Amino acid sequence: MMNMQNMMKQAQKLQKQMEQKQADLAAMTFVGKSAQDLVTATFTGDKKMVSIDFKEAVVDPDDMETLSDMTTQAINDALAQIDEATKKTMGAFAGKLPF
């Protein structure tokens, strides 16, 4: 019975640590960039978009496709950074679970 209590305490401790790491990650800022940094997309670690900025050179009413492509590039870059940081931050807990 004591072993089960220890496992529960350990699980609760890990849960608190995970929650703190998630909060830390959510507070971080990630900036994704397109080719030549013409478009930047800024997100928080919990994948909420903060801003998207365009350099004047990329804004051409006759070429909206390029603007769209670069916007997609910047957003995907930021999201990939968040995913990588999440793996590094939260992956450490996988081997520590008591069950």
Curated annotation (Swiss-Prot):
Pfam families, sorted: YbaB_DNA_bd
Domain of life, per lineage: Bacteria
GO molecular function (one): DNA binding
Cell location: Cytoplasm, Nucleoid
Gene Ontology CC: one annotated term: cytosol
Main location: cytoplasm
Keywords: Cytoplasm, DNA-binding
Function summary: Binds to DNA and alters its conformation. May be involved in regulation of gene expression, nucleoid organization and DNA protection.
Family: Belongs to the YbaB/EbfC family.
Name of the protein in question: Nucleoid-associated protein SUB1611
Record lineage: Bacteria, Bacillati, Bacillota, Bacilli, Lactobacillales
